[in-house]
Amino acid sequence: MAQNSLRLVEDKSVDKSKALEAALSQIERAFGKGSIMKLGAKDSVVEIETVSTGSLGLDIALGIGGLPKGRIVEIYGPESSGKTTLALQTIAEAQKKGGICGFVDAEHALDPIYARKLGVDLENLLISQPDTGEQALEITDTLVRSGAIDVLVVDSVAALVPRAEIEGEMGDSLPGMQARLMSQALRKLTASISKSNCMVIFINQIRMKIGVMFGSPETTTGGNALKFYASVRLDIRRIGSVKEREEVVGNQTRVKVVKNKMAPPFKQVEFDIMYGEGVSKTGELIDLGVKAGIVEKSGAWFSYNSQRLGQGRENAKLFLRDNPELLREIETALRQNAGLIADRFLENGGPESEGDEAADM
Protein backbone atom coordinates (compact mmCIF):
# COMPACT_ATOMS: atom_id res chain seq x y z
CA MET A 1 0.00 0.00 0.00
CA ALA A 2 1.40 3.37 -1.04
CA GLN A 3 2.26 5.72 1.79
CA ASN A 4 0.50 9.08 2.00
CA SER A 5 2.54 11.90 0.52
CA LEU A 6 1.12 14.25 3.17
CA ARG A 7 2.39 14.28 6.71
CA LEU A 8 1.71 16.36 9.77
CA VAL A 9 3.91 19.44 9.67
CA GLU A 10 4.72 21.13 12.95
CA ASP A 11 6.56 24.05 11.39
CA LYS A 12 4.40 27.16 11.89
CA SER A 13 6.01 28.92 8.94
CA VAL A 14 4.53 26.49 6.38
CA ASP A 15 2.31 28.09 3.70
CA LYS A 16 -1.25 26.97 4.50
CA SER A 17 -2.55 27.66 1.00
CA LYS A 18 0.08 25.35 -0.55
CA ALA A 19 -0.60 22.66 2.07
CA LEU A 20 -4.34 22.89 1.37
CA GLU A 21 -3.74 22.72 -2.39
CA ALA A 22 -1.65 19.56 -1.93
CA ALA A 23 -4.34 17.99 0.27
CA LEU A 24 -7.10 18.81 -2.25
CA SER A 25 -5.12 17.41 -5.18
CA GLN A 26 -4.46 14.18 -3.25
CA ILE A 27 -8.18 13.80 -2.43
CA GLU A 28 -9.11 14.38 -6.09
CA ARG A 29 -6.53 11.80 -7.25
CA ALA A 30 -7.90 9.26 -4.80
CA PHE A 31 -11.65 9.88 -5.17
CA GLY A 32 -12.05 11.71 -8.50
CA LYS A 33 -12.58 15.30 -9.60
CA GLY A 34 -15.43 17.04 -7.78
CA SER A 35 -15.11 14.92 -4.64
CA ILE A 36 -14.19 18.10 -2.74
CA MET A 37 -14.72 21.75 -3.68
CA LYS A 38 -15.42 25.17 -2.23
CA LEU A 39 -19.13 25.60 -1.56
CA GLY A 40 -19.37 28.95 -3.34
CA ALA A 41 -17.61 27.66 -6.47
CA LYS A 42 -20.89 26.33 -7.90
CA ASP A 43 -23.93 28.62 -7.70
CA SER A 44 -26.30 25.68 -8.13
CA VAL A 45 -25.16 24.18 -4.84
CA VAL A 46 -26.40 27.21 -2.89
CA GLU A 47 -29.76 27.53 -4.65
CA ILE A 48 -32.56 25.30 -3.35
CA GLU A 49 -35.00 24.01 -5.94
CA THR A 50 -38.51 23.52 -4.55
CA VAL A 51 -41.85 21.97 -5.45
CA SER A 52 -45.08 23.62 -4.28
CA THR A 53 -47.32 21.69 -1.88
CA GLY A 54 -50.47 23.04 -3.52
CA SER A 55 -51.09 25.20 -0.45
CA LEU A 56 -49.81 28.79 -0.61
CA GLY A 57 -49.91 29.12 3.18
CA LEU A 58 -47.81 25.97 3.69
CA ASP A 59 -45.33 27.08 1.00
CA ILE A 60 -44.87 30.36 2.92
CA ALA A 61 -44.61 28.53 6.26
CA LEU A 62 -41.82 26.31 4.85
CA GLY A 63 -39.80 29.48 4.24
CA ILE A 64 -38.43 28.51 0.81
CA GLY A 65 -41.64 28.41 -1.25
CA GLY A 66 -42.32 24.69 -1.07
CA LEU A 67 -40.72 21.33 -0.32
CA PRO A 68 -36.98 21.04 -1.16
CA LYS A 69 -35.75 18.78 -3.97
CA GLY A 70 -32.83 16.44 -3.28
CA ARG A 71 -34.06 15.93 0.28
CA ILE A 72 -36.12 13.50 2.37
CA VAL A 73 -39.52 14.72 3.60
CA GLU A 74 -41.75 13.03 6.20
CA ILE A 75 -45.50 13.69 6.42
CA TYR A 76 -47.19 12.12 9.44
CA GLY A 77 -50.46 12.38 11.32
CA PRO A 78 -53.57 10.47 12.45
CA GLU A 79 -55.82 8.54 10.09
CA SER A 80 -57.80 10.53 7.48
CA SER A 81 -55.92 13.74 8.27
CA GLY A 82 -54.83 14.49 4.69
CA LYS A 83 -51.35 12.92 4.46
CA THR A 84 -51.82 11.22 1.09
CA THR A 85 -53.81 14.21 -0.24
CA LEU A 86 -50.89 16.56 0.53
CA ALA A 87 -48.42 14.14 -1.13
CA LEU A 88 -50.63 13.80 -4.24
CA GLN A 89 -51.03 17.60 -4.47
CA THR A 90 -47.21 17.88 -4.43
CA ILE A 91 -47.00 15.30 -7.24
CA ALA A 92 -49.59 17.27 -9.25
CA GLU A 93 -47.59 20.51 -8.83
CA ALA A 94 -44.35 18.77 -9.91
CA GLN A 95 -46.08 17.31 -12.98
CA LYS A 96 -47.34 20.78 -13.97
CA LYS A 97 -43.66 21.81 -14.27
CA GLY A 98 -42.91 18.76 -16.45
CA GLY A 99 -41.47 16.60 -13.66
CA ILE A 100 -41.57 12.78 -13.60
CA CYS A 101 -43.13 11.38 -10.43
CA GLY A 102 -43.51 7.96 -8.82
CA PHE A 103 -45.75 6.49 -6.11
CA VAL A 104 -44.72 3.40 -4.13
CA ASP A 105 -48.08 2.20 -2.80
CA ALA A 106 -47.08 -0.14 0.03
CA GLU A 107 -50.58 0.17 1.54
CA HIS A 108 -52.20 -0.92 -1.77
CA ALA A 109 -54.82 1.78 -1.20
CA LEU A 110 -54.24 4.49 -3.82
CA ASP A 111 -57.51 5.69 -5.37
CA PRO A 112 -56.74 6.72 -8.99
CA ILE A 113 -60.08 8.54 -9.39
CA TYR A 114 -59.36 10.75 -6.36
CA ALA A 115 -55.76 11.31 -7.55
CA ARG A 116 -57.06 12.52 -10.93
CA LYS A 117 -59.45 14.95 -9.20
CA LEU A 118 -56.45 16.45 -7.37
CA GLY A 119 -54.78 17.16 -10.70
CA VAL A 120 -52.44 14.15 -10.93
CA ASP A 121 -51.60 13.05 -14.49
CA LEU A 122 -52.19 9.29 -14.11
CA GLU A 123 -50.88 8.48 -17.61
CA ASN A 124 -47.41 9.71 -16.61
CA LEU A 125 -47.41 8.62 -12.95
CA LEU A 126 -45.20 5.63 -12.14
CA ILE A 127 -46.83 3.34 -9.57
CA SER A 128 -45.56 0.25 -7.76
CA GLN A 129 -47.41 -1.97 -5.28
CA PRO A 130 -44.63 -4.05 -3.68
CA ASP A 131 -45.15 -7.21 -1.63
CA THR A 132 -42.49 -6.60 1.04
CA GLY A 133 -40.66 -3.70 2.64
CA GLU A 134 -37.34 -4.80 1.13
CA GLN A 135 -38.88 -4.84 -2.36
CA ALA A 136 -40.41 -1.37 -1.85
CA LEU A 137 -37.12 0.16 -0.72
CA GLU A 138 -35.13 -1.56 -3.52
CA ILE A 139 -37.57 -0.11 -6.07
CA THR A 140 -37.22 3.30 -4.39
CA ASP A 141 -33.41 3.06 -4.50
CA THR A 142 -33.39 2.05 -8.20
CA LEU A 143 -35.73 4.89 -9.20
CA VAL A 144 -33.73 7.47 -7.23
CA ARG A 145 -30.40 6.28 -8.70
CA SER A 146 -31.81 6.59 -12.24
CA GLY A 147 -31.70 10.38 -11.83
CA ALA A 148 -34.91 10.72 -13.87
CA ILE A 149 -37.42 11.06 -11.01
CA ASP A 150 -38.34 14.45 -9.54
CA VAL A 151 -40.75 13.41 -6.76
CA LEU A 152 -41.17 9.93 -5.27
CA VAL A 153 -43.77 9.15 -2.60
CA VAL A 154 -43.64 6.10 -0.31
CA ASP A 155 -47.07 5.40 1.26
CA SER A 156 -46.50 4.43 4.00
CA VAL A 157 -43.58 3.55 6.30
CA ALA A 158 -45.92 1.52 8.54
CA ALA A 159 -46.80 -0.72 5.56
CA LEU A 160 -43.14 -1.54 4.78
CA VAL A 161 -43.34 -5.03 6.28
CA PRO A 162 -40.03 -6.97 6.45
CA ARG A 163 -39.95 -10.21 4.43
CA ALA A 164 -39.24 -12.27 7.57
CA GLU A 165 -42.46 -11.01 9.15
CA ILE A 166 -44.54 -11.87 6.07
CA GLU A 167 -43.03 -15.37 5.83
CA GLY A 168 -43.44 -15.96 9.57
CA GLU A 169 -46.60 -16.85 11.45
CA MET A 170 -49.16 -14.58 13.09
CA GLY A 171 -48.02 -13.68 16.59
CA ASP A 172 -44.27 -14.02 15.91
CA SER A 173 -42.32 -11.35 17.78
CA LEU A 174 -39.68 -9.64 15.63
CA PRO A 175 -38.68 -6.54 17.63
CA GLY A 176 -36.85 -3.75 15.84
CA MET A 177 -36.81 -5.43 12.42
CA GLN A 178 -38.68 -2.65 10.62
CA ALA A 179 -36.53 0.01 12.31
CA ARG A 180 -33.34 -1.78 11.17
CA LEU A 181 -34.74 -2.05 7.63
CA MET A 182 -35.50 1.69 7.50
CA SER A 183 -32.13 2.63 9.00
CA GLN A 184 -30.21 0.59 6.42
CA ALA A 185 -32.33 1.87 3.51
CA LEU A 186 -31.94 5.53 4.51
CA ARG A 187 -28.16 5.14 4.84
CA LYS A 188 -28.08 3.94 1.22
CA LEU A 189 -30.65 6.41 -0.11
CA THR A 190 -29.38 9.70 1.33
CA ALA A 191 -26.39 10.23 -0.99
CA SER A 192 -28.35 9.08 -4.09
CA ILE A 193 -31.24 11.44 -3.29
CA SER A 194 -28.89 14.42 -3.02
CA LYS A 195 -26.99 13.63 -6.24
CA SER A 196 -30.11 12.94 -8.32
CA ASN A 197 -31.97 16.00 -6.93
CA CYS A 198 -35.00 13.78 -6.30
CA MET A 199 -37.42 14.54 -3.47
CA VAL A 200 -38.54 11.44 -1.56
CA ILE A 201 -41.68 11.87 0.57
CA PHE A 202 -42.28 9.24 3.25
CA ILE A 203 -45.84 9.15 4.59
CA ASN A 204 -45.95 7.85 8.16
CA GLN A 205 -48.54 6.82 10.73
CA ILE A 206 -48.84 7.54 14.44
CA ARG A 207 -48.64 5.00 17.27
CA MET A 208 -49.04 5.41 21.03
CA LYS A 209 -46.22 4.75 23.48
CA ILE A 210 -47.36 2.78 26.52
CA GLY A 211 -46.75 4.11 30.03
CA VAL A 212 -45.85 7.70 29.13
CA MET A 213 -46.65 9.96 32.09
CA PHE A 214 -45.34 13.31 30.80
CA GLY A 215 -45.27 14.80 27.31
CA SER A 216 -46.90 13.41 24.20
CA PRO A 217 -47.42 9.62 24.09
CA GLU A 218 -47.42 9.74 20.27
CA THR A 219 -44.60 8.39 18.12
CA THR A 220 -44.12 7.51 14.46
CA THR A 221 -43.43 4.02 13.09
CA GLY A 222 -40.13 2.75 11.65
CA GLY A 223 -37.77 3.81 14.44
CA ASN A 224 -35.81 7.04 14.79
CA ALA A 225 -33.74 6.95 11.57
CA LEU A 226 -36.29 8.81 9.44
CA LYS A 227 -36.53 11.60 12.04
CA PHE A 228 -32.79 12.23 11.64
CA TYR A 229 -32.52 11.87 7.85
CA ALA A 230 -35.61 13.97 7.00
CA SER A 231 -34.88 17.61 6.13
CA VAL A 232 -38.56 18.53 6.59
CA ARG A 233 -41.14 16.88 8.87
CA LEU A 234 -44.80 17.90 8.63
CA ASP A 235 -47.38 17.07 11.30
CA ILE A 236 -50.86 17.20 9.72
CA ARG A 237 -54.06 17.12 11.81
CA ARG A 238 -57.80 17.37 11.21
CA ILE A 239 -59.14 20.08 13.55
CA GLY A 240 -62.74 20.40 12.38
CA SER A 241 -65.29 19.97 9.60
CA VAL A 242 -66.37 22.18 6.71
CA LYS A 243 -70.17 22.13 6.36
CA GLU A 244 -72.70 23.24 3.79
CA ARG A 245 -75.88 23.45 5.85
CA GLU A 246 -75.90 20.04 7.60
CA GLU A 247 -73.69 18.19 5.11
CA VAL A 248 -69.96 17.77 5.82
CA VAL A 249 -68.07 18.63 2.61
CA GLY A 250 -64.48 18.83 3.86
CA ASN A 251 -61.99 18.96 6.73
CA GLN A 252 -60.36 21.90 8.46
CA THR A 253 -56.68 20.97 8.59
CA ARG A 254 -53.68 22.24 10.53
CA VAL A 255 -50.11 21.53 9.39
CA LYS A 256 -47.17 22.18 11.67
CA VAL A 257 -43.58 22.25 10.37
CA VAL A 258 -42.03 20.17 13.16
CA LYS A 259 -38.55 20.07 11.58
CA ASN A 260 -37.05 22.26 8.88
CA LYS A 261 -33.37 22.29 7.92
CA MET A 262 -33.97 24.91 5.22
CA ALA A 263 -35.67 27.68 7.25
CA PRO A 264 -36.91 28.36 10.81
CA PRO A 265 -39.21 25.52 11.95
CA PHE A 266 -42.35 25.33 14.15
CA LYS A 267 -44.52 27.50 11.91
CA GLN A 268 -48.07 26.24 11.47
CA VAL A 269 -50.82 26.98 8.99
CA GLU A 270 -54.49 26.07 8.63
CA PHE A 271 -56.47 25.37 5.45
CA ASP A 272 -59.50 23.42 4.21
CA ILE A 273 -59.30 20.09 2.40
CA MET A 274 -62.52 19.63 0.42
CA TYR A 275 -63.73 16.12 -0.38
CA GLY A 276 -63.04 15.25 -4.01
CA GLU A 277 -61.20 18.53 -4.58
CA GLY A 278 -58.17 18.72 -2.30
CA VAL A 279 -56.81 21.90 -0.70
CA SER A 280 -59.33 24.75 -1.02
CA LYS A 281 -57.28 27.42 -2.77
CA THR A 282 -59.99 30.10 -2.59
CA GLY A 283 -60.64 29.60 1.14
CA GLU A 284 -56.93 29.72 1.90
CA LEU A 285 -56.41 32.93 -0.10
CA ILE A 286 -59.28 34.60 1.78
CA ASP A 287 -57.85 33.57 5.18
CA LEU A 288 -54.29 34.65 4.32
CA GLY A 289 -55.59 37.85 2.72
CA VAL A 290 -57.44 38.82 5.91
CA LYS A 291 -54.34 38.09 8.03
CA ALA A 292 -52.14 40.16 5.71
CA GLY A 293 -54.64 43.02 5.45
CA ILE A 294 -55.04 42.53 1.69
CA VAL A 295 -58.63 41.30 1.98
CA GLU A 296 -60.84 43.46 4.21
CA LYS A 297 -63.35 41.91 6.59
CA SER A 298 -66.16 44.03 7.97
CA GLY A 299 -68.61 42.01 10.03
CA ALA A 300 -69.53 39.06 7.82
CA TRP A 301 -68.62 40.87 4.57
CA PHE A 302 -65.35 40.30 2.70
CA SER A 303 -64.03 42.87 0.21
CA TYR A 304 -60.92 43.49 -1.89
CA ASN A 305 -60.00 46.96 -3.23
CA SER A 306 -63.48 48.25 -2.28
CA GLN A 307 -65.09 45.41 -4.27
CA ARG A 308 -67.35 43.18 -2.20
CA LEU A 309 -66.56 39.46 -2.47
CA GLY A 310 -69.56 38.19 -0.52
CA GLN A 311 -71.29 37.91 2.83
CA GLY A 312 -69.80 35.00 4.73
CA ARG A 313 -66.69 32.97 3.91
CA GLU A 314 -68.45 30.38 1.73
CA ASN A 315 -70.12 33.06 -0.45
CA ALA A 316 -66.77 34.84 -0.84
CA LYS A 317 -65.20 31.52 -1.91
CA LEU A 318 -67.90 31.01 -4.56
CA PHE A 319 -67.42 34.57 -5.87
CA LEU A 320 -63.64 34.10 -6.25
CA ARG A 321 -64.16 30.72 -7.91
CA ASP A 322 -66.34 32.43 -10.54
CA ASN A 323 -63.81 35.29 -10.97
CA PRO A 324 -60.39 33.68 -11.61
CA GLU A 325 -58.76 37.01 -12.62
CA LEU A 326 -59.51 38.50 -9.20
CA LEU A 327 -58.31 35.27 -7.55
CA ARG A 328 -54.96 35.52 -9.37
CA GLU A 329 -54.65 39.20 -8.39
CA ILE A 330 -55.08 38.37 -4.68
CA GLU A 331 -52.63 35.46 -4.98
CA THR A 332 -50.00 37.71 -6.60
CA ALA A 333 -50.41 40.29 -3.82
CA LEU A 334 -50.02 37.56 -1.19
CA ARG A 335 -46.87 36.16 -2.82
CA GLN A 336 -45.34 39.66 -2.84
CA ASN A 337 -46.05 39.91 0.90
CA ALA A 338 -44.92 36.33 1.66
CA GLY A 339 -42.09 37.43 3.98
CA LEU A 340 -44.43 39.70 5.94
CA ILE A 341 -47.02 36.92 6.30
CA ALA A 342 -44.42 34.39 7.45
CA ASP A 343 -43.02 36.74 10.10
CA ARG A 344 -46.22 38.31 11.43
CA PHE A 345 -49.30 36.36 10.61
CA LEU A 346 -48.51 32.64 10.64
CA GLU A 347 -48.91 31.19 14.11
CA ASN A 348 -45.55 30.25 15.53
CA GLY A 349 -45.78 27.38 18.00
CA GLY A 350 -42.44 26.67 19.68
CA PRO A 351 -41.11 23.20 20.44
CA GLU A 352 -42.38 23.39 24.00
CA SER A 353 -46.00 23.56 22.76
CA GLU A 354 -45.75 20.38 20.67
CA GLY A 355 -46.68 18.00 23.48
CA ASP A 356 -49.54 20.21 24.69
CA GLU A 357 -50.93 20.49 21.18
CA ALA A 358 -50.86 16.73 20.71
CA ALA A 359 -52.63 16.26 24.02
CA ASP A 360 -55.39 18.69 23.02
CA MET A 361 -56.25 16.73 19.90
UniProtKB/Swiss-Prot annotation:
GO biological process: DNA recombination; DNA repair; SOS response
Pfam families per UniProt: RecA (PF00154), RecA_C (PF21096)
GO-annotated molecular function: ATP binding; ATP hydrolysis activity; ATP-dependent DNA damage sensor activity; damaged DNA binding; single-stranded DNA binding
Listed GO CC annotations: cytosol
Membrane-traversing stretches: none
Sites where the protein binds ATP: 77-84
Coiled-coil ranges (or none): none
SUPFAM superfamilies: P-loop containing nucleoside triphosphate hydrolases (SSF52540), RecA protein, C-terminal domain (SSF54752)
Keywords for this protein: ATP-binding, Cytoplasm, DNA damage, DNA recombination, DNA repair, DNA-binding, Nucleotide-binding, SOS response
Localization per Swiss-Prot or TrEMBL: Cytoplasm
Family: Belongs to the RecA family.
Function: Can catalyze the hydrolysis of ATP in the presence of single-stranded DNA, the ATP-dependent uptake of single-stranded DNA by duplex DNA, and the ATP-dependent hybridization of homologous single-stranded DNAs. It interacts with LexA causing its activation and leading to its autocatalytic cleavage.
Name of the featured protein: Protein RecA
Organism: Sinorhizobium medicae (strain WSM419) (Ensifer medicae)
Higher taxonomy: Bacteria, Pseudomonadati, Pseudomonadota, Alphaproteobacteria, Hyphomicrobiales
